[in-house]
């Protein structure tokens, strides 16, 4: 909502924000938002909540459980809303030791979701899965109308077929999660507090100014106010993580 150049609102839709807890919203919040709209005497003056947008994992590295997704799905069904899941980091969510969701679950419980490629080792692109029948029919037309059509080709499909069928998509993401847990443990052992409890490839820690300066001499990390983000990826090596862990121990 803050880095997308108003792309959603540029299509004539309005974003209704809900407060999050560690990057997540709940079925109860969504139900309250929808109910508030339908309880209005004159709802025609207000924005109709029509689609719920979630990220898996969230921007904070946290995960929705299958139970939470099912509850949100049920609310969406009750109020006639679509459920969309942003899967830019899908591989890292599926590979987490705390995850209990599968791609099959997303296919059954959402209307639209996508399997992230660019952040998970693909050359380019994302794989969009549409399960809602009423959205499938005109989707290519929507793409054309909004200038979102790639030149015709077969390479994007080939790379996803190769990565998914071989299992490399899942294995590479899981490796990144395992390495992130090593970084997490190193910070925990050092007594460094975390801004949020994450079991995926993104770790958000709260460093002192001195600790930041020491690590910044060798490493690049995103400084988000009081919080610093350390990420692993499909390309991260064990040697790189071992070096970082050693330097964390020296803080």
Please give the residue ranges for each predicted region.
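Short, conserved phosphate/pyrophosphate- and ester-handling motifs at nucleotide-, phospho-/glycolipid
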Residues: 240
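Conserved PLP-enzyme active-site core in the AAT-like
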Residues: 1-218, 222-236, 244-247, 251
